[in-house]
């Protein structure tokens, strides 16, 4: 038997080669929503009526679904006011990001300031975490929007990295084209 005399060579782990679609964008600008932005044509927007089994806080929560990648960008919006004070919303956003510190080995944050006058923070959580990409956008007086990218897969940074990088480009485009309507 030839197989008995051959040397064993371990094989490295392999991942599927992904074919990414061409970057093309469309506008989300539905009547009644306090914001608008551009998102990729290979994604769809769905109204998010439930949040962990409970009714969503308001009608402006959405998911941007990436069906080819089994991912979704969860967008939650809150109007700043007596029940949603800016400091509290800001603290909640940081705390939600910090919940990943058990699995994360680093959290990078960068300030967002766009040509449209939008400000916020972009978080990259590194490690095998449920949501590596998170951000919030605000005008600090009326509007607060938070986004988090999730995949329907067990977190594995190595296998998700190519898809993560591809969709992060779309998220950054969304942020750059984002506008408050009022």
Predicted regions: what they are:
Residues 22, 29-31, 58, 117, ...:
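Residues that act as N-cap/strand-start positions at coil-to-secondary-structure junctions
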Residues 8-11, 105-182:
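Short, well-structured beta-strand
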Residues 33-91:
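Secretory pathway targeting signatures of secreted, lumenal, and periplasmic proteins
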Residues 12-33:
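Post-signal peptide N-terminal segment of mature Sec-exported envelope proteins
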Residues 2-3:
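C-terminal motif of bacterial Sec signal peptides marking the signal peptidase cleavage site
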Residues 90-99:
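Short, solvent-exposed helix-to-loop capping segments enriched in aromatics
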Residues 41-53, 98-112:
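Short secondary-structure junctions
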